[in-house]
Amino acid sequence: NSHEEFESMMNKIPSSVLVILDLAYFEYVDAEDYVNANELMSKYSNLLITKTFSKIQGLASLRIGYGLAQPDLIAVLNKIRQPFNSNSLAQEAACEAILDEEHIKKSVELNSYQRDFLHQQLTDMGMECIPSQGNFISFKGNFDAKDLFTNLMKQGVIVRPIALYDMPEYIRVTVGTKDENEYFLEKLKEVIS
């Protein structure tokens, strides 16, 4: 959603209702009208913005992230959070990762290029792709999503059926390296032919 759409929604929500905005894929987004987290945070006292180190920084196994909000909301959250809610290794890795601008830049460039490549290849194969701003593509075609998931797993390719998101015909694939994406496409062609 655009910044304007999000603000429109926020203006309809009572200030007593906590709104959580998950920006897990924020760094991947290249849409100019995407939400401006700093502007939103300073404007809405009931907004909690969450970020993770699992995506662009690649620290998924460390299970670490953070929240941004106005001071009063942070004070309330600090009263109810568990002590020692992240380990020191995860904290140290996160501190280093957030400063590694070169890694983030390279990851964004690789993802953008490979996402466009995958989107084009899937479209050329007759798939219907949902435009993506993240590190994944959701698509459907002339196949049963559950069967495709099972058959690709047998080939060593992990995709995700997204019926739980009320999209039973769609499969979601994570954007990988050039070699990973080419392997996925090769196996996809084998499975659907």
Predicted regions: what is each one?
Residues 46-123, 127-130:
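PLP-dependent aminotransferase class I/II
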Residues 69, 139-143, 175-177:
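Short beta-strand-to-loop capping motifs
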Residues 4, 151-155, 160, 164-193:
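PLP-dependent enzyme catalytic core of the Aspartate aminotransferase-like
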Residues 1-19, 23-54:
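Active-site pre-lysine segment of PLP-dependent enzymes
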Residues 61, 133, 166-169:
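Short acidic/glycine-enriched loop/turn segments that link adjacent beta-strands
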Residues 112, 120-155, 171:
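Conserved PLP-binding catalytic core of the aspartate aminotransferase-like
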Residues 21, 49, 86, 159-161:
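Hydrophobic residues in well-ordered beta-strands that form the structural core
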